[in-house]
């Protein structure tokens, strides 16, 4: 990844939840290449350690802490550790999430619906609250919540995920109004079809398995059906998502708050 001179994050620190995932890693790289220190939070300590190791080439401070975003005590502990180690956090990318089961509405399992809501709504709330408290004490900063285009248009067979991401967009709009006077900007990001990566592979395989009227039963055919729905006729890249996060955090977006940035290729 090459540096983009538009953004100078030297001397700043970004905290990224879901730091062991594909988007978390790409975003960490995007900020590190422009000088930001990185704090990773995730439940998967092994994968998170791999990401931290990969960031060493950028010669910026990197910290990693285990955190269950659904647990307020865990989030508070992770923020305390990060602040004690780094002094302050300037940006928070509220990125941890879970796609959940793919199933028709009348067949959707209640237990998995609850799990999706716990991670994608309660988890985002816990991190958003902790981030707001810290940034208020620092006199301001920026938060980006990971939503999804599923929270804009409601895709088939993704009932819980769509519900959770609609909620994230709503929380973002309210938090932006509540926190503006404290100098805290809050925006959300809604990618649509992003790949290659773990979530893209999972999505095509599980949509095919549902057997709905919308998609073929062959994952490869589903992949082509999805790409054909994009006016630009390609997937978005992880780096393009990371670029969206960087823009929303940067001074270039200093008059933008309460905004949901759609990264959709024109969908």
Predicted regions and their residues:
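Canonical Rossmann dinucleotide-binding motif of NAD(H)/NADP(H)-dependent dehydrogenases/reductases
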Residues: 7-39
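C-terminal substrate-recognition "lid" of short-chain dehydrogenase/reductases
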Residues: 125-128, 136, 232-263
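Active-site helix of classical SDR
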Residues: 128, 164, 172
């Amino acid at each position: 990844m090459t540096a983009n001179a538009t953004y100078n994050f030297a001397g700043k620190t970004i905290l990224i939840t879901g730091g062991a995932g594909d988007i978390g890693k790409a975003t960490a790289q995007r900020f590190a290449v422009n000088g930001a220190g990185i704090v990773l939070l995730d439940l998967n300590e092994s994968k998170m350690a791999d990401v931290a190791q990969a960031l060493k080439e950028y010669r910026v401070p990197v910290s990693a802490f285990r955190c269950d975003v659904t647990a307020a005590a865990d989030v508070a502990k992770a923020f305390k550790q990060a602040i004690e180690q780094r002094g302050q956090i300037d940006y928070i990318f509220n990125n941890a999430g879970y796609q959940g089961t793919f199933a028709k509405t009348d067949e959707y399992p209640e237990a998995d619906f609850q799990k999706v809501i716990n991670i994608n709504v309660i988890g985002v709330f816990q991190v958003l609250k902790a981030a707001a408290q810290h940034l208020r004490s620092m006199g301001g900063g920026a938060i980006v919540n990971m939503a999804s285009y599923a929270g804009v248009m409601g895709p088939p067979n993704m009932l819980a995920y769509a519900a959770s991401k609609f909620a994230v967009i709503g929380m973002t709009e309210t938090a932006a109004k509540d926190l503006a006077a404290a100098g805290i900007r809050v925006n959300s990001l809604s990618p649509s079809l992003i790949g290659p990566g773990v979530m893209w592979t999972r999505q095509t395989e599980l949509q095919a398995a549902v057997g709905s009227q919308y998609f073929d039963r062959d994952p490869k055919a589903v992949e082509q059906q999805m790409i054909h729905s994009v006016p630009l006729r390609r997937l978005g890249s992880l780096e393009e998502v990371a670029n969206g996060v960087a823009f929303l955090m940067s001074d270039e977006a200093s008059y933008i708050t309460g905004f949901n940035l759609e990264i959709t290729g024109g969908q």
